[in-house]
Every structure is written in structure tokens, then in C-alpha cells.
Amino acid sequence: MVVTIISVFFAIVIGLGIGYYVRKSQDAHKVISAEQMATNILEQANNEAKSLKRAAEVDAKDLAQTYRNQVNDSYNDRQKHLQQQEQRLEDRINNLDKKDAALNQRDASLIQKENQVQTRLDDADKKEVLAQKLLTTQQDKLEEIAQLSPDEAKKQILSETKASLTRQRAALIKEAEEEATSEAEKRARNIIVQAIQRSSADSVADVTVSVVNLPSEDMKGRIIGREGRNIRTLESLTGIDLIIDDTPESVVLSGFDPVRREIAKMALDALVADGRINPSRIEEMVEKSRRQMDETIREKGEQAVFELGLRGMHPDLIKMIGRMNYRTSYGQNVLQHSIEVAKLAGMMAAELKMDVALAKRAGLIHDIGKAVDAEVEGSHVELGVRLAEKFNEKPIVINAIASHHGDVAAISPIAELVAAADAISAARPGARSESLENYVQRLKDLEAIANNNQEVHTAYAIQAGREVRVIVEPTKVTDLQAKVLAHDIKSDVEEKLEYPGHIKVTVIRETRAIDYAH
């Protein structure tokens, strides 16, 4: 019995232990499940929060972009509206200016008419006085006629009538001549004014320097070279003076010949861009620049011919036209002057129902002699006539060239128009400068004196005419003869030129030995 009770007791204890263990295991499992569920809920909440945040950011960006677009559209509309307002205001100002000009013109016309009316009133008063005198005279004559026979009275009346008609005829002829002259002058003035108003031209004075910009100050030393070899080579090959001073990152090219100066500028730009600067490279770039300059000159000529709508020009003549772009006359660019003359002559020819193309052609090449006047003897008129004859231009064009300075008589109205257009172009304010022309002419004369010697290969006036650099053939001139040549040129300069200060004469005799290794 006791054993049974003990067994039951142990069974109960064991059952309770097992139950406690099972219950504890279930509670632990529930805790783990709850923690897992909480973790899932937290992750889900975080994901939803991130999604909501991204959606909010997208909505905010869209809203900001929409607002930005609205602001831009509003700004553009306002800007467009302001531009329209400005345009309307400008149009209104222009209309007011036109109305003001019209009113001024009307006032001037009214004043002129008032003066004419006053003049006519004065004439009427004078005629009234004259008529009264004539009436008195006629009455006196009638009294005399009353004492004459019928035949004598008839003869006297016929004689007086004939004399009166003769005087009236002479007065009418004189009045017609004066009216025709006045109308012709007025018509000519109107034609010239219309041509000038339709032709726009720049008033730009040509200069004798060009500036080359450098990437750094160190480039100046490379341009000068060791012991100045590079700069001397460039100056000798181009005849242009290089001025290297304290001006930051720039070199000034000085020379009166625009072609030489442009060649030197092109060569120096190429050398600076390439970076290799030495005497042999300088010679190569100068030669390349000369070829490029020939092409540029041709393009300038073609552009001028195309601008004026001319055809049938000889290619060599077109190239000569391009060379005029690098010539100046009293500071005025010769090509621009010639184009302006061609346009003026063409417009006046159109007003007078003449050949417009022929007038433009004659105007364009009227100064063609200036393209070669530095190389060939003779005035630019003589050289221009020779060139026009060489390229088979029409006699009217040749005569326009020959007569535009009054050297020969004009044989056609076209020649007169060209001369008038030339005078208009040269006479407008700012077109020409006497001092620059005299300066350039002095430099040309200085070079001509040096080149007049047979031993001279070429000569360049540099340093604004304070130095002439003479290059001679080493096979023809010795060192001793070079000194004599410098003295002779110096004497010729002193005798033939007037100049301030002094002029340095430098004779360069250079010997080169060249061989090739194979």
C-alpha cells in the first residue's frame, strides 16, 4: 500500500515536471514567435517608410520641376513681352523721327514757298510800276501818232511790235536756259545724294603695326634666339621690324608694307603655335606664309568681283585687284576705296539709265595701277592703263582709268561718273590721312634709293624709317665693298631725302655653306 502511494506520488511529481517542462517549452516558442513577428512587422514598417519617403521625394522633385517650369515659362513670357514692348517703342521712336524729319522738311518747304510768294509779290509790284510807265509812254506815243499819216503810223506800230516781240523772245530763251541749267544741277545733285545714301563705307585708318599675342612671356626669349639669331633672321627675310618690349605676352610687328607685315605675322603665329623656332624653321614658315598670302590675295580679288556681281575678269587681273587690299592711298585702303567707287558709279549709272556693270567694272579697276606702283616705274594711272590694255578691257574702261585724275579727256559719260565717284569717296570725312601717306612715301623712297644700286639684292626700311637694312649678294660684294656701298647709300639719302634725326644704313653680307649627308 505504501509502495503504491509512493508510486502514485512519484508519478504525480514526474507528471508535474513533464507538464512544467512542456509548458515552459511552449512559452519559449511563443516568445520566439512573437519576437520574429515583431521583427517582421518592424522590417515591413521600415520598408513602407522608405517607400513613402521615396514617393515623397519623387513628388517633391516633380512639384519643384513643375514650379521651375512655370517660373521659366513666366519669365520667358515676360521677357518676350518686354522685347515686344521694346520693339514697339523703338518702332514708335523711328516713326517719330521720320515724322520729325518730314515736319522739318515741310517747314523748310513752306519757308521756301513763302519766300517765292514774297518774291513774286515784289515782282508784281515792279511790273505794276513798269506797266504804269509803259501806259504813260504809250499815251505819249499815241499823241505823236495822231499827228502822223496812216502809213507812217502803221510802220511805226509794226516796228515797235517787232522790237517788243524780239525782246520777249530773248527773255523767254534766257529763262528757258536758266531753268534747264537749274534742273540739270538739281537732277545731278539728287543722283549723287541718292548714290551716297545707298552706299555705306567704313572710315577706318590703316595702321603700320600688327600685334602677335604670345602664350607666355618665355616665348619672347625663344623668338629672340641665341645672340638674337632668330629675330635677325625673321627681320631679314620679311623686312619687318619686331618690337619686343615690356608689353605682356605680345610682340609688335612694325612696317609700312602691309603685305610684308601680314607675311611676318602669319609666319610668327605659325612659329609660336609650332613651338620650334630656329633660323631654318623661320625660313620654312616665311616661305609657307608667302604662298598663303598669294592665295589670300586671290581670294580677296574674287570676293570683290563677286560682291559687285562682275563677270569675265581675267584671273591675273583678279589677283591684282586682291593686291589692292594691301595698298593704301593717304591712309585709305585702295581695295575698299575701289569697291566704294564702283558702287557709287554703278548707282549713278542706274539713275541715268546707263550700263551699270560697265560703270562698276571701270570703278573697281580705276586704281589698279596702285597694285604694282611700288615695283614698276610710272604713275598709277599709266600702270593702270597698261594693265587694262594687257587684259583686253573695253576702251571705255581704259579711258575711265586714264581720265579719272584729268590727265586725259573723258570720252564717255561712264568715265565722268567714275571720276565723280572717285572724288566723292576720297573727299568724305575720315577717308584719307595726309600724314600717313607722306610717312609711307618716305619709306618707299628710302628703299628705292638703296635698291637703285646693282649690288643690292633687296632692301628694307625698318625702325619707322630710322634704319635701312640692305642685303647684298656675297658673290658680288666683298666686305670692303660693303663698307663703300653703305657710304654711297648714306650719301644718296642725305642728298635726296628730307628727314628728322638720322638714318642708319646697314649692309648685310651673309655667306652660307650647305652640304647634305647621305
From Swiss-Prot:
Q: Provide the HD domain boundaries.
A: 334-427
Organism field: Leuconostoc mesenteroides subsp. mesenteroides (strain ATCC 8293 / DSM 20343 / BCRC 11652 / CCM 1803 / JCM 6124 / NCDO 523 / NBRC 100496 / NCIMB 8023 / NCTC 12954 / NRRL B-1118 / 37Y)
Similarity field: Belongs to the RNase Y family.
Q: What is the main EC category here?
A: hydrolase
EC number, UniProt record: 3.1.-.-
Membrane-spanning ranges: 2-22
Report what the protein is called: Ribonuclease Y
- GO BP of this protein: mRNA catabolic process
